[in-house]
Amino acid sequence: MIHDLLLACRSHNPEQLGIKAFNETTVIDQFIHPCEREIFMDIIKIIKVYQEVEQFTHSSGRKSDTHGELPDSLHGYYLLNLAKGIEMALEEYYAEIGRLEKYCLGNERNSLSYVYNALYAKFPLLVFMRNLITEIHVLNLRGCVLLHNLHQQCEHGDIQLEKAIKIIMKPVKNAFFSSLAHWLLFGVIDDVHSEFFIKFTPTDAVDGSSFSKSATCSLLSAEKNPEDYIWQYEVNMSQLPGFFSIVLAEKVLFVGQTVLVFKMGRNVKVKNKTDPLAAKLAELDSDDIYQLWSGRESEFFKMVVDLSNEDTINVFRLEKVIIDIKNYVSARLSEIAVNEVDLERQMGLIKDFFLLGRGEFYLEFCSQMVGTMETYREERFKNVTRSFELAATVTGITDDLDKFSLICQRSTSEPDDTSDFNFLQGLSLKYEYEWPLNLLFSPTTIERYNNIFRFLLIIRTYQYEIQRVWAKQTWRAKSAKDVPPNNKIITLRNYLMFFLNNMQYYIQVDVLESQFGILMNVIKSRSDFEVIQRAHTVFLANVLSHCFLLNESETQLNVTGSQNRNPIYGTLLKLFGICEKFAHMTQTKDPSDDLEDEVDQLNESFGVQIASLIQLLVDVKSASCLGPLSQLLLRLDFNCWFSASHNTSA
């Protein structure tokens, strides 16, 4: 009977536990003394706990599909390895059962109490495993979060349980470090269940989910959209383990993205064509990342393997290994970007065209474009790109403009298709950056540059048109000597020009020059690429903030031409609208009879809006310490002309 009881200790199916039914019959009295029945029931309880654990390992560890298809999403790769770890931890329990079987077979007289005492020594281990499985099911733990839960339980007061949890965690830990090594060194993630803390989210995903996205799917996305490919990888916050900080996860993401950039296309430029090694490297396939690692990938791989071989996760050593790999990758990338690609010159071109640094070019472009905007809408989109090319030819900068092209985006939701403002909002620049600057100019970054570009182009275009008002009024006064110049038009024109000139000076000098100088100092110091990347992000954020192109939460860009949350920007839009109406009103061939009344209305509207702008700037300045904003306020209202006229205290 005891041997049957020991056989039941290995059974994983509670339905086939015949020894339990034996207790419900009267035959049990012939084999077990009534005093031992309680001991017998306690052994049954131990067996039931074991069966709960064994059922989990059997259901989670089996192959759910024998035809090579993807398994059920409920059985992830980490759960599979958890089942393997539990099976490994149960080996000690199985060994004890085997020892008891040999002992009982070798002795004629066996005690049920002896069997119970031997099994009870393993009971805490079984209960611990059952509680662990229950917690995983209740909290729905999976992936890296599951590993974090196991890591938290490593520091255990019971030596037996501490040893067991390390055995259980080992396969799960190996799976984690395997994914980490493949991402860091090869830029590969084969994560069909989204269990890793780096995930791939294709741009055409409906719900933003990365489930069922394998490495094959990501490669197809790379071929379809190579420019946006690396930015489709992001930190999966739902799977970020607690022992991994967000900053450290961003470093891991950066390293993997860098590897992807090298795999997608190195485009090695051979400066010394007589060097056979350099020529050979230039002929290598784009999937070769030798230029990045320089043969040190085995060294870094061994560092990750050593982390995996430790009994527990050494958080401090893990952080040090990742930082060492990141520093090496960042230094190599900085060396290539600064020396081979000439990052300083690339940023100079960005400033010249996105930030309107080439004043003579954009003056000529405005001259060409203003005539284009007077045509019908369909002709505008056809002619504006031609105006851009003509301006480059006239100013002799065609070579510098090779990497830039003007794009016209047609919007069907515009409230007024004839509005110059809405037409300007459809313009954007496309920049063909050189490899490996993919990591610096993401699609989001280019879109932010285009927001600044459109904002500056609007100011520059209205400056040109308001200047034409003065030229036309002066020409009329000289050509018709008996008709004096309209003082109301000239006065309002001076007000508008004063506003536009100060806005342009504030943005170009107080904001762009100072912030761009800080960025260039970082680049010239030849810092590692992550520092350059961070400085570039700060540069863009500061420029957008000082140009009032961010809303109050500074998380979303204002959609120009629509309702927004930034009151300063909304006031600027109204002032731009006044500039546009004034330019059209005063330059028509047949002005209306009530032109002066319309000018008076615009003058009054301008006074209200400029006073509102000054008051908003005063409020913002008092709530912050923005130096450039103080300069703008001082220039706009240096003699309190506008504030005194509209009872606004500056």
Curated annotation (Swiss-Prot):
Question: Which GO MF terms are attached to this record?
Answer: gamma-tubulin binding; structural constituent of cytoskeleton
**What Gene Ontology cellular component terms go with this record?**
centrosome; cytoplasm; gamma-tubulin complex; gamma-tubulin ring complex; microtubule; spindle pole
Q: Which UniProt keywords apply?
A: Cytoplasm, Cytoskeleton, Microtubule, Phosphoprotein
Q: What does this protein do?
A: Gamma-tubulin complex is necessary for microtubule nucleation at the centrosome.
* Name of the protein: Gamma-tubulin complex component 4 homolog
Residues the record lists as Phosphothreonine modifications: 216
Gene3D superfamilies according to UniProt: Gamma-tubulin complex, C-terminal domain
Q: Where in the cell is it found?
A: Cytoplasm, Cytoskeleton, Microtubule organizing center, Centrosome
The record's InterPro entries line, in alphabetical order, gives: GCP, GCP_C, GCP_C_sf, GCP_N
Q: Name one GO biological process term.
A: spindle assembly involved in female meiosis II
**Residue numbers bearing the Phosphoserine modification:** 214, 218
| Family from the record | Belongs to the TUBGCP family.
Primary site of residence: cytoplasm
Protein's UniProt keywords contain Oxidoreductase: no
- Which Pfam families did the record assign? GCP_C_terminal (PF04130), GCP_N_terminal (PF17681)
